[in-house]
């Protein structure tokens, strides 16, 4: 009896001491315990995602990759795997599990390794949200008390959902959704049992037990999880065996980017940081929907890069990127090649490769990610030697002339129906490019290419590169002339100018390119054929200051427009986006729209945080609505009208002729515009203008089609370097030779883009606005005629400006000439 009494007393003392100790610990740490009620409104750090307007993922920004999921969206097997491995008594304890700890301790003693977690899931959640990972007694005490508080606040289901979305699982992946994407490139619902078990085993050591770090460790840990699931009767023996037999592959899957638009993504990222701050932008799970259309963006990517590489290749091959081993040295092993090339960048569909052997008409190469491949002669016989921008060597007769074993080169795949059929020799271009597509009705930028490759160079040439625009400026000057009273039939003297510049003490002699002159020529032809001396004379008719002021209607700044007659030849400097904005005025019948890139921003719950409200074109009668907005002192939602509908129509007529020319070839009256290559589109609802700067340093094509304005630019980032010229190369399909220009160097990108963008878009009939007259004129004089033969044609005029004289009454003095400035001849 005495023994029993002593035992009871001892037990009572232990209980009292235990309770006292627990309360003592509790009151000691109480002031340091966080308010677990914050878990009710917790917002998990989730990266920002950037999408196209039609929902294609463009980019993801944020250190922590997380795909938040509801518990009901997670497979039952995943929940069971985590519970079996981390906390098999999860539904039986209240946050702290002494029995589980004891059992885990015995398991360690029995097996020598920890197959079961010592901390409950709730404790792990407490640690992840409120505590550090330092291994100290007081931290463990706090962890227990916080876990108990959490269990009182949240249901078991809520705790599980938070845990499975919060836990770190390696490779910047937080939560099971991100881990499924990172390791398997799948959504959680599509995981196999083996994949589920692998993810469920990661909380123990996510950095060292993931399959990318160690396939062996990941496999062993997965098998431990499967064994626990079998022990807990969550799976059958057959399911266990099948899951164990699944191979573990060490492959990392980043966020599944569906659309390549990195320059747009960077615009969105910078905009979000400026608007919301860096922390909120990167961690609040915002979904940013841009104005980019995935179809148009893919078309712009393809067109701009194909055109840039075509330019680069016709100028010749500059040689290998580097030499990995010399011909008389042992070749690298497949392991060396694979490891080396895996660390080299890939630029879009341009892959690094190593030359293994060279035959007379073929070469064997090792391509990054694709191993041994063969380059056929027809895929590399373009590679004559680059001498300088104006000179190329002779056509090669053998692959040995430009390739050797041990060289690192660049290759591109040829594809058919999505499958690779061959590999083509290529090179990283020295020149660069930009492309912009804009909706002229509201200013939405629907496609943007800022350069050859964002990884190669992050500078955005579409928005940041201010370049001389060359003849691209002429439509705006001719629009000013129409506003002044000139017409499409007005004759301007196409003759050389030689004017003395007193300030410089030299003669100024602007010339046509090519230097041919046709005498008195109609305004329509002058713009379509981009005649420089006519542009100068048109500028003089309007007046320099009046022209510069008029050009500000299109969004151009006065300080971008030189106060000299060189403005007529394109001495002004603008960005491709500004050019697209300017040409939108012609395309939309005279309205000024502002370019914008962000359509809306949604928070993780689908609520709209921001929605763009661009000023849109109003084609119907809006004057009553405008008066109403004025009375209410409210901003109008409509774009302001900056030129008349008639002016825009007549300018489009000249831009149409830049592509389609005019006259009849059968009667020797036919002529082409500088944009004639766009006739390949076989559409009569398009128009545009070439642009080539002095010494061909910049090449442009700017044009419109139904609902789209597109601008293509090609040039060197080094402003002093010109685009050069090439000799013919019969080994290049659709070869272009001679001096580079807007029509040769930029227009092909515009044509390829439009051919893709306008698929399934019906041709629009010409809409002639009110107050436009159509009369028959004489082709040579621009005066009225009664003749019905090839010497006559119909022309459009703003009502009241059509000619009143007939050709028989024509006298030479009706030709426009200028008295401004002293012309020597």
Swiss-Prot record:
Q: Which residues lie on this side of the membrane: Cytoplasmic?
A: 1-6
Compartment(s) of residence: Cell inner membrane
- Pathway assigned in UniProt: Cell wall biogenesis; peptidoglycan biosynthesis
An example molecular function term from Gene Ontology annotations: penicillin binding
Q: What is its main location?
A: membrane
Q: Specify the signal sequence span.
A: none
Q: Which organism encodes this protein?
A: Vibrio cholerae serotype O1 (strain ATCC 39315 / El Tor Inaba N16961)
What are the boundaries of the region Transglycosylase? 48-216
Instruction: Name the catalytic site residues.
Output: 86 (proton donor), 471 (acyl-ester intermediate)
Taxonomy, top ranks, is: Bacteria, Pseudomonadati, Pseudomonadota, Gammaproteobacteria, Vibrionales
InterPro entries of this UniProt entry? Beta-lactam/transpept-like, Glyco_trans_51, Glycosyltr_51/Transpeptidase, Lysozyme-like_dom_sf, PBP_transglycosylase, PCB_OB, PCN-bd_Tpept
Membrane-crossing ranges are 7-27
Indicate the family of this protein: In the N-terminal section; belongs to the glycosyltransferase 51 family.
Please give the function described in this protein's UniProt entry: Cell wall formation. Synthesis of cross-linked peptidoglycan from the lipid intermediates. The enzyme has a penicillin-insensitive transglycosylase N-terminal domain (formation of linear glycan strands) and a penicillin-sensitive transpeptidase C-terminal domain (cross-linking of the peptide subunits).
Which GO biological process annotations does it have? cell wall organization; peptidoglycan biosynthetic process; proteolysis; regulation of cell shape; response to antibiotic
Membrane-related topology note: Single-pass type II membrane protein
Please report the name of this protein according to its UniProt entry.
Answer: Penicillin-binding protein 1A
The EC number(s) given in the record are: 2.4.99.28, 3.4.16.4
Q: Which reaction does it catalyse?
A: [GlcNAc-(1->4)-Mur2Ac(oyl-L-Ala-gamma-D-Glu-L-Lys-D-Ala-D-Ala)](n)-di-trans,octa-cis-undecaprenyl diphosphate + beta-D-GlcNAc-(1->4)-Mur2Ac(oyl-L-Ala-gamma-D-Glu-L-Lys-D-Ala-D-Ala)-di-trans,octa-cis-undecaprenyl diphosphate = [GlcNAc-(1->4)-Mur2Ac(oyl-L-Ala-gamma-D-Glu-L-Lys-D-Ala-D-Ala)](n+1)-di-trans,octa-cis-undecaprenyl diphosphate + di-trans,octa-cis-undecaprenyl diphosphate + H(+); Preferential cleavage: (Ac)2-L-Lys-D-Ala-|-D-Ala. Also transpeptidation of peptidyl-alanyl moieties that are N-acyl substituents of D-alanine
SUPFAM superfamilies under this entry? Answer: beta-lactamase/transpeptidase-like (SSF56601), Lysozyme-like (SSF53955)
Q: Return the GO cellular component terms, semicolon-separated.
A: outer membrane-bounded periplasmic space; plasma membrane
Periplasmic topological intervals: 28-825
Annotated region described as Transpeptidase, given as residue ranges = 413-752
Keywords assigned by UniProt? Antibiotic resistance, Carboxypeptidase, Cell inner membrane, Cell membrane, Cell shape, Cell wall biogenesis/degradation, Glycosyltransferase, Hydrolase, Membrane, Multifunctional enzyme, Peptidoglycan synthesis, Protease, Signal-anchor, Transferase, Transmembrane, Transmembrane helix
Listed Gene3D superfamilies? Biosynthetic peptidoglycan transglycosylase-like (1.10.3810.10), DD-peptidase/beta-lactamase superfamily (3.40.710.10)
